[in-house]
Each structure stands twice: as structure tokens, then as C-alpha cells.
Design a protein with these regions (language model features):
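Outer-membrane beta-barrel "beta-signal"
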Residues: 227-237
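Extracellular/periplasmic loop regions
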Residues: 26-169
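Membrane-embedded beta-strands of outer-membrane beta-barrel proteins
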Residues: 5-7, 42-44, 116, 182, ...
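C-terminal beta-signal and adjacent terminal beta-strands/loops
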Residues: 190-220
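Transmembrane beta-strands of outer-membrane beta-barrel proteins
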Residues: 10, 20-24, 56-60, 130-134, ...
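Repeated loop/turn-to-beta-strand initiation elements of outer-membrane beta-barrel proteins
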Residues: 15-19, 52-56, 124-129, 186, ...
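Residue-level signature of outer-membrane beta-barrel architecture
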Residues: 11-13, 46-50, 61, 120-122, ...
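A compositional/structural signature marking long, glycine- and acidic/polar-rich segments
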Residues: 1-45
């Protein structure tokens, strides 16, 4: 059995100031209790529209797994792995065009984050820029790390948002990441758009023995100090 419910809304009374929010809850139950999933994900956006662009602040929080893998997952179950969002184009799936994305995960379940952006900045006709900075972390119990690091990459799917998911990363409450991204779009013709996306992601994994130990993310890194980074420059049409 599975159930989802959500509510979304916005306040534009003080236009050009806008407040928007989104709250979702989902659960999925199976005969085997270890496969059960139940959780929620919420986000909040504050933005102010100006003539040259729209600055904004936002944040999100998704429930994470507790320290007991036998009672199922406390992350919200999802049907599609393509969980698009408007906050992150690199760490999560947020790019509407062909791009490299989802470096941390296909959606934001099991994570929290705060961010700031300058959206649709434009000084030339049909050319827009969006700059974003996100700081995020996991909401999963550190103890759950051993159930990932002590198994193969494929087996680690059992502690992600649903059994057949292969998210690249599994963040605990002791893990953090910083994302900086710049998206540029040029509408050359009505039906032809050129997009240049540049992003950088720094990741800090807790390499203490209580979390990832000396081998953070089995089959992801061999040794190291728990600090990793990735970058991407992507051109699409």
C-alpha cells in the first residue's frame, strides 16, 4: 500500500515580494517491515522581483532514516527517480535541459539545505543568468553509514529512498556539502535555446569511526580525509 499527500501555495499580497512553500508526505508499506517507507519533505522560498532579476532565499528539509534499519526507512518514498527542483542544478535533479546532475541524489529526501540565488538576471534581451549558492547536509542517522559502507554499491540501495534507487551519495547528519552554480540561457529563436551551466560541489564526509570510518562510501573512495569535490561545465541546446 502507498499513499502521498501534499500542499503547495504562495503569497503575492506584497508584490513584488513573494512567499512560496511546498509540503509533501508519503508512505509505502510492505509485508516485510524492513521495506516500509514513510517520510516528508518541505521547502520554503522568499524572493523579491526587481527589474533586472529576482533575488531569493530558500530552504528545504526532508526526514531521514533513524538508527534502526529493521523498522524501514523514514525517508519519503518516491515513484520517479527524476525529482526535479528549482534550487539545485548539480547536486540534485534541477536542470530542465540535457545536463549532468544528481551528483548527490536524484531527489532531496533525507537532506536539508539553505540557499540564496539571483534568478533570471538579464541585461541583454533574451539572455538570462541564475547564480545560486547552497549549503546542505543529511538528515540520516550516522549509525546508518555502516549499512552502506559495509556493503557493495548495489546493496546500498536498501537504505535510500526506495529499494531500487541507486543514489550516488547517502548523507548523514554529520555530512555536509556546498554547491555553487551559474546557469546561463540564451533564447536564440522561439524554439531554440542555448544553455551553459557551470557548477562546483564540495563535500565533507565525517570520516570518524562512528560514521564512515577510514573508507567513506564504500566503492566511492578509498581512504582520504573525507573531503571531496566535483565540478561540471555543460553546454546544451
Amino acid at each position: 500500500n502507498a499513499f502521498w499527500a501534499g500542499v503547495t501555495g504562495e503569497v503575492t499580497y506584497w508584490d513584488p515580494f513573494r512567499i512560496a512553500w511546498d509540503v509533501n508526505y508519503g508512505s509505502a508499506s510492505y509485508e516485510d517491515e524492513k521495506m516500509n517507507r514513510e517520510g516528508w519533505l518541505a521547502s520554503l522560498l522568499l524572493e523579491y522581483k526587481l527589474d533586472w532579476g529576482t533575488p531569493g532565499l530558500y530552504g528545504w528539509y526532508g526526514s531521514g532514516d533513524d538508527s534502526n534499519p529493521r523498522n524501514g526507512s523514514e525517508r519519503m518514498p518516491v515513484v520517479s527517480a527524476n525529482g526535479n527542483n528549482g534550487f539545485s542544478n548539480f547536486a540534485f535533479n534541477g536542470n530542465p535541459y540535457i545536463a549532468r546532475e544528481g551528483v548527490l541524489g536524484t531527489n532531496m529526501t533525507g537532506t536539508w539545505g539553505i540557499g540564496a540565488r539571483l534568478k533570471d538576471v538579464s541585461f541583454l534581451e533574451d539572455l538570462k543568468h541564475t547564480l545560486r549558492v547552497n549549503f546542505m547536509g543529511g538528515t540520516n542517522a550516522p549509525k546508518m553509514a555502516k549499512y552502506v559502507s559495509h556493503n557493495s554499491f548495489k546493496d546500498s540501495a536498501s537504505v535510500t529512498q526506495y529499494g531500487t534507487s541507486y543514489d550516488p551519495m547517502y548523507l548523514t547528519t554529520d555530512d555536509y556539502a556546498l554547491e555553487i552554480g551559474l546557469t546561463n540561457t540564451y533564447k536564440m529563436y522561439d524554439n531554440f535555446t542555448v544553455m551553459l551551466d557551470a557548477s562546483y560541489l564540495a563535500l565533507w564526509l565525517d570520516d570518524s569511526r562512528s560514521t564512515w570510518g577510514k573508507n567513506p562510501m564504500a566503492n566511492f573512495a578509498k581512504g582520504g580525509d573525507g573531503i571531496y569535490d566535483a565540478w561540471n561545465v555543460n553546454l546544451s541546446f
